[in-house]
Amino acid sequence: SKKWFWQGMMKVEQQQKGSYREFIRAYAACAAFADAQIGRVLDALDRSPRRDNTIVVLWSDHGFHLGEKDHIEKFALWEKSCHIPFIVVAPGVTRPGTRCDRSVDMSVLYPTLLELCGLPGDTKCDGESIVPLLRDPTKKWARPALTTYMRGNHAVRSERWRYIRYADGSDELYDHENDPNEWDNIAGDERFAAVIASHRRWLPKNEAGQVPDLRRKPGR
C-alpha cells in the first residue's frame, strides 16, 4: 500500500499545481547547502597543520525516494533508500579521484578506522575492514552489503543483485545489470533460485530481541 506521506504529497499536488516540483527543489537546495558547509570544513582542514594526518569520512545514514516506486521517503529496502554516499580520504592510502564499485555497508566503518589508525580490533565485530579496497578499488570483494529496516526485514546487495526478505516471508529480487530502477521483481522466477539461495545465506541468523516501549511503563 502507498505510504501516507506519498498520498499526502499527491493530494497537495492535485490542490496546488507545482507543489511536487517545489518539494524536489527544496530537497536539492538542502543537499546543496549541506555540500557547501562540508566544503567550509574541508577548506579549514586544508589550511591546518593536520591536513596530512587526518582521516576524512563522509557518509549518510540513508538514501531517499523522490517519487520512485510511488515513495517520497526513506522507509524502504530498495536501492534509492539504501544507496548512500560513502567517501573516505586517508592520507597515504587513498588516491584522489578514485572510485570503488564494490557493495559495502556501514558495518565496515569501525574496523576500517581501527586498521587505518593502527589500533587493536574487536574480534566480535560484524564488519570487515575495507582498507584493501581503499588501496586498490578494483580488488575483488565477496561480501555483499546488508541493510535492515525494523525487525525481520533485510536487504542483501551484491554488485549485480538486490535480494529483499521481509518478516512475513515474502521476498524480492532485482537484477541491476538489466533493471537498475528495480521495476521487475523476479524472485518468483525459478531460473534465479540459485541467486536467491546465495544471497539468503547472508541474512542474519539471529536478531536482537524486541526493545520494550518504556513510554508505557508506570511513571514514564
Locate predicted features.
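C-terminal cap/loop subdomain of S1 sulfatases and analogous C-terminal strand-loop tails that border
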Residues: 62-68, 94-95, 105-110, 115-176, ...
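Active-site-proximal cap/lid insertion segments
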Residues: 1-103, 116-124, 165, 182, ...
